[in-house]
Amino acid sequence: MRRPDKSHFFILLLALSLLSACKRNFQYSVLEVKPLANDLNQQAIDRLTTIPQNDTFSFLIISDTQIAYDELEAFVKHANQIPQDSVAFVLHGGDFTDYGANFEYNLYYDDIKKLKFPVIGTIGNHDMLGNGRGIFNRYFGPEDFSFNYGNTTFIVFNSNSREVAFDGNIPDLDWLKTETQRAAKKKNIIYLSHIAPISLDFDQTKAEPMARLLSTTANSRLSIHGHSHSFDYSEFFDDGFPYLVAPTLLKRSYVKVNVADTTLTVEELFY
């Protein structure tokens, strides 16, 4: 009688344990495109129209949540303890994923769908790897868009120049200029993109023109970014215009911005 091969039992046991222990979505191929949701940014913007808006409000910023799944889960639990009327929404500074894989987007969604506040995000450079850009478009919608909250316009755009080999198309400064003109009657304009113009991953032929556009637009108040993983709030070009870089969520920190008419205050918070 043939004895059973113990190695087969071990492999079977390992497989069963992995399947039973896995509480998150599983992906059979890194090329798989099966998003769990669509047009998340527009859904969040639509939610904003259902709540009272005024010129005094606060919002939170998180960024670079790739591989920070435990920290993201903890942030959601932390933020859900914040009173609903003290925060309007959350901005995400990009890099939802590390490799642009569908399962990474799904892992992010598994956690963020439990957050009680609307979340609006910009595309990060890691989100453009592989077929990640297409998945981002399905999950979140357009890369360049704007929305209003009260008397403030938020302009969100792709600034990941290196991912397109600095071909001159990212960021789209013509589109950006048009959006600032459309928002001319608003009290404030706040910008959101992943890579700040001082980074070498930003097309340096566009850095000064963009900085000049932002600093000379009368109602421009703040430009928000991620990418560098460390908190920074300063003038990058000595032109009086402030830039804010949000830290990676791996540091268990995020940023709160308070808007009071045309005055903004910024604070880094930990949880």
Please identify what each model-predicted range represents:
Residues 80-89, 164-241, 267:
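His/acidic metal-ligating clusters that form di-metal
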Residues 25-42, 46, 147, 232-271:
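Binuclear metal-dependent phosphoesterase catalytic core
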Residues 65-68, 96-99, 125-129, 154, ...:
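Solvent-exposed loop/turn segments at secondary-structure junctions
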Residues 73-144, 148-149:
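Core catalytic region of metal-dependent phosphoesterases/phosphodiesterases
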Residues 22-107:
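N-terminal active-site segment of His-dependent metallophosphoesterases
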Residues 1-22:
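Sec-dependent bacterial lipoprotein signal peptides
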Residues 62-63, 89-95, 118-125, 157, ...:
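Active-site neighborhood of phospho(di)ester-bond hydrolases with catalytic His/Asp-centered motifs
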Residues 50-60, 146-156, 184-188, 236-242, ...:
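Beta-strand-turn-beta hairpins that frame and shape the catalytic cleft
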